[in-house]
Each structure stands twice: as C-alpha cells, then as structure tokens.
Amino acid sequence: MTRLTVVFLAILVLLPLATSNSGADEAPASLSDLLHRTKRCAGGNQCTTDAECCGNYQCRCSLASNCSGSNPKKRCT
C-alpha cells in the first residue's frame, strides 16, 4: 500500500472515534473533587451556594456578622 492509502484508511478508522458522542470527552471527577463535595453534604460545612449543599440543606449565614463584607462565611444548614 502507498502512504496515501494508509493515511486515508487511518482517517476512515479514526474519524468515527473522534466524533462519537459517548461522553468520553467529559473528564471524570477526581477523588479530591468527590471528597470535597461529600464534605459539604453534611450540615454545618462551609458553602457559597445552595447547590453545594445536599438534601434539604441550604447555604446560609449563621450569624449576621458573618454576612458582612465581600467574603461572607456561609454554612449548609
């Protein structure tokens, strides 16, 4: 086979693999990400949004003094 034929065949084989929509291009969550999310699922852990809290927990300021400033300290409650 000529080089051109080999390149053409390689493209035919690899093109469907590169364009498949199997979700393989999504990076798996790292162990540290999973642990970080798990820690926030318990009540009382720090958060920035309700999405970081599990179940019926909501991200709220525990004290009014914690809510002032540009970096409020919130917890899942």
UniProtKB/Swiss-Prot annotation:
The keyword Signal applies. Expressed by the venom duct. Keywords: Cleavage on pair of basic residues, Disulfide bond, Secreted, Signal, Toxin. Residues 22-40 form a propeptide. Its main location: secreted. Contains 4 disulfide bonds. Residues 1-21 form the signal peptide. GO terms for cellular component: extracellular region. One of its GO terms (molecular function) is toxin activity. The keyword Membrane does not apply. The cysteine framework is XV (C-C-CC-C-C-C-C). This is Teretoxin Tan15.2. It comes from Terebra anilis.
